[in-house]
Swiss-Prot record:
One of its GO terms (molecular function) is lysine-tRNA ligase activity. It catalyses: tRNA(Lys) + L-lysine + ATP = L-lysyl-tRNA(Lys) + AMP + diphosphate. Keywords: Aminoacyl-tRNA synthetase, ATP-binding, Cytoplasm, Ligase, Nucleotide-binding, Protein biosynthesis. Its EC number is 6.1.1.6. It holds the Pfam family tRNA-synt_1f. A motif ('KMSKS' region) lies at residues 288-292. A motif ('HIGH' region) lies at residues 33-41. Belongs to the class-I aminoacyl-tRNA synthetase family. It comes from Aeropyrum pernix (strain ATCC 700893 / DSM 11879 / JCM 9820 / NBRC 100138 / K1). The keyword Protein biosynthesis applies. One of its GO terms (cellular component) is cytoplasm. Its main location: cytoplasm. This is Lysine--tRNA ligase. It is found in: Cytoplasm.
Amino acid sequence: MPVHWVDKLVAELEAKLQNRGKDEYIFNGGLSVSGLQHIGRLRGEVLLGEAVRRELEKRGFRVKQLLTLYTVDPWKGKDEQRREFPDPKAAERYVGWPLDRVPDPKGCHASWVDHFWSDFGPYIGVFTDGKIEVVTTRELYKGRLKEFITTMVLPRRDEIRRVINKYRGRKPYQEGWIPLEPRCARCGRIDSTEALEILGGERVRYRCSYCGYQGESSIEDSKLNWRIEWAGVWWSLGVDFEPYGKDHATPGGSRDSAAELARLLGFEPPEGVWYEWVSLRAGGREADMSSSGFTGITPREWLDIAHPQILRFIYFLHPPTRRVVVDLSEIPSYYSQYYRAERIYFGIEEASTVEETRYLARTYELSHPSNPPAKPPSQIPYSHAAIVAQVVGPERLWTDGLERLKRAGLLGHDEYSIRWAKELLEKAYKWARRYAPKHLKFEIPDSPPEDALRRIEKPDLLEKLAEVLESVEEWSEERIKQALVEFGEGMSSSERRRFYRDFYLAIVGRPEGPRAAPLLSLMDRGFVVDRLRKAANLSRELKGR
């Protein structure tokens, strides 16, 4: 693998920023809070800029990172959006309203924006170093964007119209066009009004094509044409670097049009890099994560089941122009990849090439919102944590759960490892309940269910297994695995399948479950032996009735 893409991007950007000659550089990202604020939005609009910022800060640059929420965009009222309301039909009245004026469909926040931002905004500091400031276009329209409109856009609106018409193709704007969309005082829409006249430089007269109303509005209660608005945000904030999604990256597309408008108005557009979407795979199907389409999971939901370092690792492992597919059933695999990079970082393991070793070590370093641990921490396989969590139950994760991990030799005594283990047990338990494959999702009933006992074919084998396990010299995964292999010697493949079917019926009450050796090693030996004997005896009794 070559030099890490983050370092390559930093090297390219460093010279370009120096040419701008500023004391402080502004990095920005942009989000429209049109619905579900999913983890895909962290990739390009938050984490990419954060990684570059932090590296430039190490080189002596002063950088301020912003995240702009486009809260004045019109609410489109897609089916998925309307279904968030108790009465989707009644919600049609909000179509065209500014996003921050649409009510919260669940009634727990002040607005649509506040509701859906609540699962994203408060968690930015968990996924990053926290040095990111959030601004909204609503705030900007009351200040710098208003100034941008009155001093730069309106005096040159005919030149702006000609630039935009180059990119529009169909339905070019006619002479006299005013690039403002006032909010209608009667119906509340901002997507159906036509600005007719500027009054005294501060107000605008308009007509609404939806309800027919004519009236006046302040400029700050209006919205710019979106291409001009993008350039206006750059100017208002003084943006020097801003990543953008692939939908804006087409040659001659929206990014190019905003950049041309910026140069027309006398300032340079920010440096940028485009990024690919993040997709979600579930049930064998893949779909791009979508805010207004309500596809994906939020940062809050991710933190329920995995550490922020894991998502950062996934994102920084791949260049931003590479598509990333997240599958929540694969969380254990993501942890395994992260742990391998951790071993490589600490020199415990090497990859197949020097280049790959360096790349993975660097990716691991970037995966930490702060600094990596000072020494190699314990590495608890995620699937093991899921097994332990289900064995002990949610109330005993930090007591019995930690103790079982220690007995299994999976947990050290350093503060970092213990904190990680506590968090991991909680996350793995929730993952097992929500996303785990069927064979990893189980409960240990107090007593084997009667229907399971009736299905046990050879209770004598379970009793013999109990004797073998009782005499295992060391209750560890490796020794248990060895004992199980030896116990199954001489069985045909079909006999071995039936034996394990009986085993799982006795232990978890189902004909399948997690791999036997890890499962047993994380349970008490005495419980396992007693359980197998009890299941064998009860099974024989039921069959003898």
